[in-house]
Amino acid sequence: MNHFPYTNSDIEPGDFVINPSNRNWGIGQIQSLIGNKVTVNFENKGKLVINTEKIILEKVKN
């Protein structure tokens, strides 16, 4: 899998991401995106709301 930084216009619900600062959270699937708030359901951490002004997620591509 390849990982790369994104802009909010590059992601949408259903996309898969990782938090490079907390890789142990595993891969997360975006549930919703409103402004700079992204709700992500991570496989090892559960559902979290991420502020994309503070944390840059990396989109996962197969």
Which residues are covered by each model-predicted region?
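Mixed-charge, Lys/Arg-rich low-complexity intrinsically disordered regions
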Residues: 1-16, 24
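Glycine-centered tight beta-turn/hairpin loop motif at sheet-sheet or coil-to-beta transitions
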Residues: 23, 43-45
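Short beta-strand-centered aromatic/proline hotspots
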Residues: 26-33
